[in-house]
């Protein structure tokens, strides 16, 4: 019954958010409730604009909630099950809190590495190895190493491997939340595989300092049409290919 009641509450909240544009004051409180309940900026924007939603609407929700002070706080994961006081660098973000458990210097002496997320076909342990090597190199160069990843199977989610580990989702919203707190020297995407690569263009649009492979180069390699055109312009042979989007194709 708890699952059914929770689902009903979320559905009711979703319907209430849809009335946001007609009552901004009530809408602000709804956004606060929605974030505590786990709604993303994308889901809030979709509830408001529905089929007319565009990427700019999601960004509007983000900027609006920030203007209201609706931002997540950072909490430490208790690795000792409350038996003893635990001060760890094992972190997560939540809207169900008041203050951060850690202090932020904002001195641009840290570098953030985005992990590979869940293992799947085409993205496995090799990207985890790359991420760990990046963390080791960052430390050797005198910077604080920061990892964002959520896969407990990986070596990169061992909090002894870096100065700060955010065990959290690899979405644009959450990554930007962390970057705004950390204010790092830069971010490394190219060691994490597909998921970080998918964020490259949007992070670049927010003027995030992407270290290593640039967002433009990542996009040129990821977009099959752009990559094919580049090979043609360079006179490099390539196999014939087609993009299939339906069964009839």
Question: What is each model feature region?
Answer:
Residues 1-5:
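Extended, well-ordered protein cores
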Residues 10-33, 39-51, 56-59, 67-249:
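N-terminal beta-alpha lobe that positions the nucleotide/phosphoryl donor
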